[in-house]
Curated annotation (Swiss-Prot):
GO molecular function terms listed in the Swiss-Prot or TrEMBL record: carbohydrate derivative binding; glutamine-fructose-6-phosphate transaminase (isomerizing) activity
Keyword Transferase: yes
Ranges where the SIS domain occurs: 277-422, 455-597
PROSITE patterns referenced in this protein's UniProt entry, alphabetically: GATASE_TYPE_2 (PS51278), SIS (PS51464)
CDD domains noted in UniProt: GFAT (cd00714), SIS_GlmS_GlmD_1 (cd05008), SIS_GlmS_GlmD_2 (cd05009)
Record carries keyword Transferase: yes
Domain Glutamine amidotransferase type-2: 2-217
Main location: cytoplasm
Record GO biological process: carbohydrate metabolic process; fructose 6-phosphate metabolic process; protein N-linked glycosylation; UDP-N-acetylglucosamine metabolic process
Annotated keywords: Aminotransferase, Cytoplasm, Glutamine amidotransferase, Repeat, Transferase
Protein name: Glutamine--fructose-6-phosphate aminotransferase [isomerizing]
Function in brief: Catalyzes the first step in hexosamine metabolism, converting fructose-6P into glucosamine-6P using glutamine as a nitrogen source.
The organism of origin for this protein: Bartonella quintana (strain Toulouse)
Pfam families: GATase_6, SIS
Length: 607
């Protein structure tokens, strides 16, 4: 969602604030702004649109000051125009905010009755006026923050600077993440480690309910009970700095091409590739005591768990429930002690998924999280973490994090099967060898990049696309449809191939192509029958299959993307790549913003 940066420095901070905001662009935004304190006075510049517009304004109106805050806004309350951009200011303070204040209408009404006027449609302005009211009553800055905080319902992370105070910044967290960076006589606050990595190499993460007072003399963090607390200081790993596109046109293109390498790192963590065995997770989880797995996730991460369901059921004979996190958290389902709850999230900050994790913990259920950000809130709160090791992912549409989630889940399923006695030593060697081949095969698929771009030229003028898949290819079809609509803004829907005749076939005509994900596996013949139904109605088919599948298909109405022949087990990981390339090239041909699609955020930290 929104991105926050705050700097209490030794020199003019405006350019550094912009640099920090650029590192937060991947989160998605529609406006931006910065505010500084110079000689006790507050100054602010904001702009609608991309950061380049803010930079142009700053050239005309430079901001001085060694204390400042910055923000990239993703609209929730109020349209994406400059007046709604952060920071918001009053005569006493400037504030940036990530989150949603659920009772802002009630608070706004109260403040209006007291004579306060509102210039924006945002919920953030309510916080600004609440703190200002408290300051006018004679409270200190710290007391004003604490008093106002008690009135707020919802999720928020805020950073505040004050008129007349060149050496004070206060940050508070109730939900969305905040990190503090420690420099030499200067300090930083940011939404995540990526924002701070170019300034410092030591950070601490604020816990839920924390608030912090920053001066050039040091940082004091207070817990929810308002008592000083010590939070562990983490040294940033080198990969946090790797946010350059290199020779690639877009971050997404770079991240797709990084998949062979990052999956190699992932597999080395979970597999003994010298002996072709799974590294045991027994010190974390005793699979013999587990009778059911509960997955709760959102978006692309949810689709990874749909694939995993097949693996855990087939290999480990475990019952699996898959839930969309935003639905699960409001159902209050009964959960027993023999359940392992698993939460998948690239950022580890997804609000709905985090709420599900907390629900399961409160009910005494063992919790595991599969995340890409190992210092995230979910990683800290779960009983144990399975890192995906994908490295920083900047493109809003997930690519390498998704395939690393699949690889992690595949290794996890093999370990469960091995512990439960349903996986022979021979089968273990066989499946681990198959996983070890994934990086090499992905490199082969990447050689089809140019061919896939040519096929995508036929998609730029369509009015919609259907994706079909069966078995483990069904979740990949769902992910393909999601990727295409995220990036190209073409309406796309994914369906289980067997559901075609139960409604979607009514949409089939020459203007709506059907993309079929169908390796030559045990489901291929049935999927081929569905393809023939499409062809009989003059539908246009794009078939993603392997050499054997292409030989069998032989339909005149299709374009074919032919992948190497591969085992059924690893097919979902391999077939994820061509559906990513289809979405990417279609979006590029249409001229959309591939790395930052409209209305989307990388880290969804509010409901």
């Amino acid at each position: 969602m929104c991105g926050i940066i705050g700097i209490l420095g030794k020199k003019c901070v405006a350019s550094s604030l912009i640099a920090g905001l650029k590192r937060l662009e991947y989160r998605g935004y529609d406006s931006s702004g910065i505010a500084t304190v110079h000689n006790g006075r507050l100054y602010r510049v904001r702009a609608e649109g991309k950061l380049v517009h803010l930079e142009e304004k700053l050239k005309k109106t430079p901001l001085k000051g060694s204390l400042g805050i910055g923000h990239t806004r993703w609209a929730t309350h109020g349209v994406a125009v400059e007046r709604n951009a952060h920071p918001h200011v009053t005569e006493r303070l400037a504030i940036v905010h990530n989150g949603i204040i659920e009772n802002f209408v009630e608070l706004q009404k109260e403040l209006i009755e007291e004579g306060y006027t509102f210039e924006t449609e945002t919920d953030t302005e309510v916080i600004a006026h609440l703190i200002t009211r408290a300051l006018k009553s004679g409270l200190s800055q710290q007391e004003a923050i604490r008093t106002s905080w008690k009135r707020l319902q919802g999720a928020f992370a805020i950073v505040v600077i004050f008129e007349g105070q060149d050496n004070l910044m206060i940050a508070a967290r109730s939900g969305p993440p905040l990190a503090i960076g420690y420099g030499q006589d200067e300090f930083f606050v940011g939404s995540d480690a990526v924002a701070l990595a170019s300034f410092v190499d030591r950070i601490s993460y604020m816990e839920d309910g924390d608030w912090a007072v920053l001066t050039r003399e040091g940082v004091t963090i207070y817990g929810a009970d308002n008592q000083p607390v010590k939070r562990p200081i983490t040294t940033l790993f080198e990969g946090t700095l790797l946010v350059s596109k290199g020779n690639h046109r877009h971050f997404m293109h770079k991240e797709m091409f990084e998949q062979p390498e990052v999956i190699s790192h992932n597999l080395a963590h979970y597999l003994d590739l010298g002996n072709y065995t799974v590294r045991s997770l027994k010190n974390l989880i005793d699979w013999k005591k587990i009778n059911r797995i509960l997955f709760a996730s959102c978006g692309t991460a949810y689709y990874s768990t749909l694939v995993a369901r097949y693996w855990f059921e087939n290999f480990a004979a475990l019952s699996v429930d898959n839930d969309i996190a935003s639905e699960f958290r409001y159902r209050e389902p009964p959960i027993t002690s023999d359940v392992l709850s698993v939460f998948v999230s690239q950022s580890g900050e997804t609000a709905d998924t985090l709420a599900c994790l907390r629900y399961c913990r409160e009910h005494g259920v063992k919790t595991a999280t599969i995340v890409n950000v190992e210092q995230s809130t979910m990683a800290r709160e779960a009983d144990f973490i399975l890192p995906t090791r994908a490295g920083p992912e900047i493109g809003v549409a997930s690519t390498k994090a998704f395939t690393c989630q699949l690889a992690t889940l595949a290794a996890m399923a093999l370990d469960a099967a091995k512990q439960r006695g349903s996986l022979s030593e021979k089968a273990e060697h066989q499946f681990v060898q198959q996983l070890a081949e994934v990086p090499r095969i992905l490199n082969e698929v990447l050689k089809l990049d140019d061919k896939i771009e040519q096929i995508c030229r036929d998609l730029v003028n369509v009015r919609g696309v259907l994706y079909l898949g069966r078995g483990t290819s069904y979740p990949i079809a769902l992910e393909g449809a999601l990727k295409l609509k995220e990036l190209s803004y073409i309406h796309a829907e994914g369906y289980a191939a067997g559901e075609l005749k139960h409604g979607p076939i009514a949409l089939v005509d020459e203007a709506i192509p059907v993309i079929v994900v169908a390796p030559y596996d045990r489901w291929f013949e049935k999927t081929f029958s569905n393809m023939q139904e499409v062809a009989a109605r003059n539908g246009r088919i794009i078939l993603i299959t392997d050499k054997r599948g292409a030989e069998v298909a032989g339909l005149d109405t299709l374009s074919t993307i032919v992948l190497p022949n591969i085992p059924e087990f690893i097919a979902p990981i391999i077939y994820a790549l061509p559906i990513q390339l289809i979405a990417y090239h279609t979006a590029v041909l249409l001229g959309t913003d591939v790395d930052q699609p409209r209305n989307l955020a990388k880290s969804v930290t509010v409901e």
